[in-house]
Amino acid sequence: MAYIRLLRRYTVKHLSHWKLWKFTFVIFIFLIFVFLLQREVGIQDFNEEPGSPSKDGKINNVLGLVLKAVNNIKVAKPKMQIKAPIRQTQKAGQKRCLPGSYTAAELTPHLDRPPQDSNAPGASGKPFKTVNLSPAEKKEKEHGDEKHCFNAFASDRISLHRDLGPDTRPPECIEQKFKRCPPLPTTSVIIVFHNEAWSTLLRTVHSVMYTSPAILLKEIILVDDASVDEYLQDKLDDYVKQFQIVKVVRQKERKGLITARLLGASIATGETLTFLDAHCECFYGWLEPLLARIAENNTRVVSPDISSIDLNTFEFMKPSPYGQNHNRGNFDWGLSFGWESLPEHEGKRRKDETYPIKTPTFAGGLFSISKDYFYKVGSYDEEMEIWGGENIEMSFRVWQCGGQLEIIPCSVVGHVFRSKSPHTFPKGTQVITRNQVRLAEVWMDEYKYIFYRRNTEATKIVKQKTFGDLSKRYELKQQLQCKNFTWYLSNVYPEAYVPDLNPPLYGFIKNVGRRTCLDAGENNNGGKPLIMYTCHGLGGNQYFEYSAHHEIRHNIQKELCLHALAGEAQLHDCDYKGKNSRTPPEEKWELREDQSLYNAALKMCLTGNKEHPSLVPCNPSDVFQKWIFGRNN
């Protein structure tokens, strides 16, 4: 109590002091005011001139000075009262978002899948086996196989609504949360088709609606690239009318995948574009992981982990809950796309299955991209025709111009991989080579000559300059300040083996005695003997390079080397792969002055006197041991 009384006495004392000080201050200000007022108005009237301020105006000036002085003193006083905070206004174009993560209820699919019959054909992604067929059924199956290059008979008997069984992705994928800030962008799914089977096309559409959150799926755009099948006309239009988000747009003449996708993108209203082929099935939770990566950085171009749907049984190869050995995209020097295992450093970087895979190239059939970035980075090369090479072109362009390509393992989409295309090319398959020349000219710098040596058709197009106008693509490259191809090989794909830019010898290898050429034979991916075949000068199976490391390389798709064995010579994977590798003696060849190909490890020479070239004791007078390198046509 004594403490409280003391505190009260102290407070009263200081308050009285404050009141006294305040009264003194007011008197002081008043005296200043009177002094200034007297000084201003006490001036003789004869000093006034026309246009000078009146007495009232002078008095107002003095009052203004006094008030400013008082206000300055007030501002200098400590502020004891706390004001309310000023609400920050939202920036224009900035989307509102709530904290935390999306709930399962928020990510409810656009459409509920109907009840499933576990015994139905192909249920839960199981295979459908076509056995004990009647003559009519066999005829139907054969027709479908020929028309679509997959078992349309099986597909037609599997429900358009089939589910794929339990979610077998790794636990970290199933439990993955997606932040509300920044919000996941909406997407327009674009599906191009040309004479597609009814069941595969509509199963793709239904699959998207059954697995894509309603708040993210803006629309599904079906782009018809001049199909002639009657069931893809009015019947399709009538069928999709039941779904407000499904649109059908048509090209009256066959222009190909590239033009059709550009048409779909031009009418899309989603913030992102998701391209799918017309024979896919989407697994659970496929869309959110793709869009989450774009939400974080809109220069990412992201692909799902593509699973296989068997072309004969339509079995869906489901992901493993324990993770799996993933692949990434690559390219060969014939500019074809391929798959390869992840390098060790990429495997170490990824802690679990939620981590993306950085990929040098992508397949190009299934991917998502920000719509704004799609156009900023150059969409597609509009002068490329039909199909082919556009995925390699976009891969090089995205990386070299500041973007990234990723494969997202938690996003799984099944795809029917066909062994051959059922479609014809209106201008022939040379349009693919023309497309490849366009990408090589713009993005590969001096490395384009590696491709030209392997493709005589490409060399012809370059000489005749029939690849079209490239000025817009060069302008884009300059505008985006894109890096060169050396940078790409050093920073994006350092694992790539780069052949000699100027090999000592290249072309076909002709045997003097038989007047036939060394030929890799069909489907020789290594481990098979070579053959002797009529020289055609078109490259391909008869293209070889004599490298600076004294190898004889056949490197159109894989890097294969002529391997010396007792008996028939074979092509094997080349041991020399660049840095930290060497050329083994069995792969070193000496082209001697007598035109023989000599292997020092076996101390033998290559002969072409039989169907398969082989190694025999050297004989300088044997014409079957003499070889000539020649340039392809």
Feature names for model-found ranges:
Residues 2-75:
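N-terminal signal-anchor transmembrane helix specifying type II single-pass membrane topology
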Residues 185-190, 219, 393:
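Cell-envelope/extracellular polymer assembly enzymes that use nucleotide-activated donors
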Residues 209, 262-272:
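Active-site nucleotide-sugar/metal-binding loop of Leloir-type enzymes
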Residues 209-250:
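Acidic donor-binding segment of Leloir-type glycosyltransferases
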Residues 258, 333-368, 376:
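A recurrent flexible, glycine/aromatic-enriched loop bordering the glycosyltransferase active site
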Residues 281, 285-339, 404:
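Conserved donor NDP-sugar-binding/catalytic core segment of glycosyltransferases
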Residues 289-290, 361, 365-368, 372-378, ...:
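A short, conserved alpha-helix in the catalytic core of glycosyltransferases
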Residues 495-633:
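Lectin-like carbohydrate-binding module/patch detector with strong preference for beta-trefoil
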